[in-house]
From Swiss-Prot:
It comes from the Bacteria. The modification N6-(pyridoxal phosphate)lysine is found at residue 240. The record marks 239 as: Plays an important role in substrate specificity. It comes from Colwellia psychrerythraea (strain 34H / ATCC BAA-681). This is Serine hydroxymethyltransferase 3. The keyword Cytoplasm applies. SUPFAM superfamilies: PLP-dependent transferases.
Length: 431
């Protein structure tokens, strides 16, 4: 039955689509959709969500305020959003074998902030991985809130193999007696030994927090050790390898920690949860529970190995000499290149990545000596080993062109761009 409105203004408000009401925003969205269709996405922290996830996020749930938690809200009319949030919680519990899950954090950074608000106090010592070694801003980097509010000490990697220096972690923990130790990061290409971190935390009586934002999809598929049996608390994003909407989760098996976390998220750090995003999280987590997700992660890892191997054959230096995960770091110093100019050249060739500091990097953060590459988005698109071998060759062509013609690499860029666009036409995104 067609709705009847009492005025033309109301009919327009409830019936007009975006293209007819705000052409400027529609144009920007269309341009971004075209970019995603026509470029190969290798940013390791990005992925491509399903149409169902996008549909859930663009629903009437965006209208609903729901401060509090299921069954304990500060507003009426929450019975249906309670169902949605409970679905998200139960699915996350099942995936990660967690007793308690908070699905309300708006981002991974806010999930980390809520954990710190709950479990440590300003001035306490925290021990996390340094940003240049592969850590994350929220783990105590100076520009971040965690670096300003806490006495942040940082561990790094060994110079000989660029892997986490667990001996240094132990030595720093004994020396500084941190209240919290943080494991995880944003550019760690090898598996993390959470059991080792637990041993170190126990030696000094520290809380162990694991940030598994990058590897949550791997953990969900059984392709990486689950941190839950070892950590006091675990945080993650819901995008990246989980292939959901942008958002965060906090997980724990400790009921006392769970109570503190819930209070820290609301009312401590956030107000009303984003129920439309939580619905999208629930849908994405439902997809993770399907057998096809395990096959997807298996392909992500296989593609990463192929890409790393191809780049090595093209003379690239891969940090840690390979990858166990979905990402890799390319050290550009042997080629005499910088991360920023390489990122720009690759983007002109239709390949999107990000400049990234490498361990012991002497360049500024906006310059860097490396790039970070990841395979989740390309794998979601349908790329397999053959496609990632081609991509590795194309990256090699762009880098070689940049070495030979640092002032104007347009010939190599245009040649690769044509090949990229032909490949992308074979693997379209949303219909």
């Amino acid at each position: 039955m067609k709705n009847t409105y009492t005025s033309g203004e109301l009919e327009q408000f409830f019936s007009s689509d975006l293209s007819s009401t705000d052409g400027a925003v529609q144009v920007a969205i269309d341009l971004e959709e075209a970019r995603q269709n026509q470029q190969i996405e290798l940013i390791a922290s990005e992925n491509i969500v399903s149409k169902a996830v996008m549909e859930a996020q663009g629903t009437v749930l965006t209208n609903k305020y729901a401060e509090g938690y299921p069954g304990r809200r500060y507003y009426g009319g929450c019975e249906h959003v309670d169902l949605v949030e409970t679905l998200a919680i139960d699915r996350a519990k099942l995936i990660f074998k967690a007793d308690f899950v908070n699905v309300q954090p708006h981002s991974g950074a806010q999930a980390n902030g809520a954990v710190m608000l709950a479990l440590v106090k300003p001035g306490d010592t925290i021990l996390g991985m340094s940003l240049d070694a592969g850590g994350h801003l929220t783990h105590g980097a100076k520009p971040a809130q965690s670096g300003k509010w806490f006495n942040a000490i940082h561990y790094g990697v060994r110079k000989d193999d660029m892997r986490i220096d667990y001996d240094q972690v132990l030595a720093l923990a004994i020396e500084h007696q941190p209240k919290m130790i943080i494991a995880g990061g944003s550019a760690i290409p090898r598996q993390i030994d959470f059991a080792k971190f637990r041993e170190i935390a126990d030696q000094v009586g520290a809380i162990l927090m694991v940030d598994m934002a990058h590897i949550a999809g791997l953990v969900a598929a059984g392709a990486h050790q689950n941190p839950l049996p070892f950590a006091d608390v675990v945080t993650t994003t819901t995008h990246k390898t989980l292939r959901g909407p942008r958002g965060g989760l906090i997980l724990t098996n400790n009921p006392d920690v769970a109570k503190k976390i819930n209070s820290a998220v609301f009312p401590g750090l956030q107000g009303g949860p984003l129920m439309h995003v939580i619905a999208a999280k629930a849908v994405a987590l439902g997809e993770v529970l399907e057998p096809s997700f395990g096959a997807y992660i298996k392909q992500v890892l296989s593609n990463a190995r192929v890409l790393a191997s191809t780049l090595q054959q093209r003379g690239c230096d891969i940090v840690t000499d390979g990858t166990d995960t979905h990402l890799m770091l390319v050290d550009l110093r042997p080629k005499g290149l910088k991360g920023n100019t390489t990122e720009e050249s690759l983007e002109r060739a239709g390949i999107t990545c990000n400049k990234n500091g490498i361990p012991f990097d002497s360049e500024k953060p906006m310059v860097t000596s490396g790039i970070r590459l990841g395979t989740p988005a390309g794998t979601s698109r349908g790329f397999g080993n053959d496609e990632f071998e081609l991509i590795g060759q194309w990256i090699g062509d762009v880098l070689d062109g940049l070495v030979a013609n640092p002032e104007d690499n347009s010939v190599a860029e245009q040649k690769v761009l044509q090949q990229v666009q032909q490949l992308c036409l074979r693997f379209p995104l949303y219909s």
